A protein has these predicted regions:
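Rossmann-fold dehydrogenase core element
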Residues: 249-255, 265-304
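NAD(P)H dinucleotide-binding glycine-rich loop of Rossmann-like/cofactor-binding domains
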Residues: 89-148
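C-terminal hydrophobic helical "lid"/dimerization subdomain
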Residues: 212, 241, 285-335
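N-terminal Rossmann-fold NAD(P) dinucleotide-binding loop
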Residues: 154-155
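Conserved S-adenosyl-L-methionine
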Residues: 163-168, 187
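Conserved acidic E/D residue at the C-terminus of a beta-strand in Rossmann-like folds
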Residues: 173
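Glycine-rich beta-strand-centered segment in the early N-terminal region that forms part
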Residues: 18-35, 49-93, 113
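Glycine-rich cofactor phosphate-binding loops and adjacent beta1-alpha1 units
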Residues: 140, 188-276
Length: 335
C-alpha cells in the first residue's frame, strides 16, 4: 500500500509499505481522510516528538492520528462493526491507504452520522481536544473567554463555546484568514496581534484590574485559552505570559498547545492573582463521542475550517501548506 512517511525535518515521502495484517478481531480501514495536526507539524518542522509516528520498513515513520475511513475487512468479528461501515477513529499512522485497528481498540470505531462527510468526520479528534479544554474551564453564561491562537484547536474551542454556552468570546491571532473564519463562526470580537497590542485590547474590552504589589495593569477575562504555545523561533512575550496577564484575579488559564522551548514567565503574577492553570491534553472517550455528536447534530459545522485537501501523493505539499497560517486552517490528506 502507499503511505506518506516522515524521514526528517521537512522530509515527507510517499512510497510503498507493507499492508497491515490482521489478527483475530482486528479491523482494517480504508483511510478516506486524515488531518495534519499541530503535533505533526512540530515533528515535520523541527524533528520534535518523532516517536509519535509508526515505523515502517524503510526507516521512516507514518504520522497522522485524526482520520476517518471505511471498514473493508474484519478478521472474525468486531462488536458493532461490519464491512462497509463509515467510521472515524484515532490512532497513529493515518497518512496511509490502510490502517489496522487492533481488536482492543475496535470500541473506538464510531459510526459517521448520515450527511457528514469523511472530511468533516476526520476533524472529530481535534474537536474533542477543544471540547476537553472547554470542559476544564467549566464556563458559565455571561463570562468572557479569550482564545489566543485561531488554528483548528482554538477555533474548535470557539465552536464548542458557541454551541454549548452563552459566554462572550474574543479570539486573538496574527492571521487575517483565520480571524475571518473566527468571525464566521460567531466570535464576538477578533484581535489581530500583529497590528495591535492584544493585552491592551483585552484590558479595554474587559476593564483594567490593578493588583497590589504588582507593577502591571491586567485584564479581567474569566478564562484565557493558550492555543498558540511557543515556537522555537518566537522572540516576543510568551502567549502564556500574555494569558496570565489578561486573566482576572482568581480566573483560569487553559494551556492546550505544545511548547517547542521553555517559556520565561513572571510567576509572581500567577501567584498574586490566584489563577488556576490547567494543562489540557487530548480528551476522554466520552468527549470524543460527544465531539462527533456535535458535528452530526449540526451544532458545530466543521466545513469552514477545512481549507485544503490533497491526495496522498502530494503529502509533502500538504504539510508545507499546513505551515502557512495565513493561507490554511485545516489541511486534509485524502489517501
Amino acid at each position: 500500500m502507499k503511505a506518506a512517511a516522515y524521514y526528517g525535518p521537512r522530509d515527507v515521502r510517499v512510497g510503498e509499505v507493507a499492508k497491515p495484517g490482521l489478527e483475530r478481531g482486528d479491523v482494517l480501514l480504508r483511510v478516506r481522510a486524515c488531518g495534519i495536526c499541530g503535533s505533526d507539524l512540530h515533528t515535520y518542522r523541527h524533528g520534535l516528538f518523532e516517536d509519535l509516528g509508526v515505523p515502517v520498513e524503510a526507516g521512516g515513520r507514518v504520522m497522522g492520528h485524526e482520520f476517518s475511513g471505511e471498514v473493508v475487512e474484519i478478521n472474525g468479528e468486531a462488536a458493532g462493526v461490519k464491512v462497509g461501515d463509515r467510521v472515524c477513529t484515532v490512532g497513529m499512522g493515518g497518512n496511509a491507504e490502510y490502517y489496522r485497528v487492533p481488536a482492543m481498540m475496535s470500541v473506538a470505531l464510531l459510526p459517521i452520522p448520515e450527511g457528514i462527510s469523511f472530511e468533516e468526520a476526520a476533524t472529530t479528534e481535534p474537536l474533542a481536544t477543544s471540547l476537553h479544554a472547554v470542559n476544564l474551564a467549566a464556563p458559565a453564561d455571561g463570562e468572557t473567554h479569550v482564545i489566543i491562537g485561531a488554528g483548528i484547536i482554538g477555533l474548535g474551542a470557539l465552536q464548542v463555546l458557541k454551541a454549548t454556552t452563552s459566554v462572550r468570546t474574543i479570539v486573538v491571532d496574527i492571521s487575517d484568514r483565520r480571524l475571518e473564519v473566527a468571525r464566521q463562526l460567531g466570535a464576538d470580537v477578533t484581535v489581530n496581534a500583529g497590528r495591535e497590542d492584544p493585552l491592551q485590547k483585552i484590558v479595554e474590552l474587559t476593564g483594567p484590574e490593578h493588583m497590589s504589589f504588582m507593577p502591571v495593569m491586567t485584564g479581567r477575562a474569566d478564562t484565557v485559552y493558550d492555543c498558540a504555545g511557543l515556537p522555537l523561533d518566537y522572540t516576543g512575550t510568551p502567549v502564556l505570559q500574555q494569558a496570565i496577564t489578561m486573566t482576572k484575579e482568581n480566573g483560569k488559564v487553559v494551556v492546550v498547545s505544545i511548547f517547542e522551548k521553555p517559556p520565561e514567565l513572571e510567576i509572581n503574577l500567577l501567584v498574586r492573582k490566584g489563577i488556576t492553570l490547567y494543562g489540557s491534553w487530548a480528551w476522554s472517550f466520552d468527549e470524543f463521542r460527544h465531539a462527533l455528536e456535535l458535528i452530526g447534530s449540526g451544532k458545530v459545522d466543521r466545513k469552514p475550517l477545512i481549507t485544503h485537501t490533497f491526495p496522498l501523493d502530494r503529502a509533502s505539499e500538504a504539510y508545507e501548506t499546513q505551515l502557512k497560517a495565513e493561507e490554511a486552517v485545516k489541511v486534509l490528506i485524502l489517501p
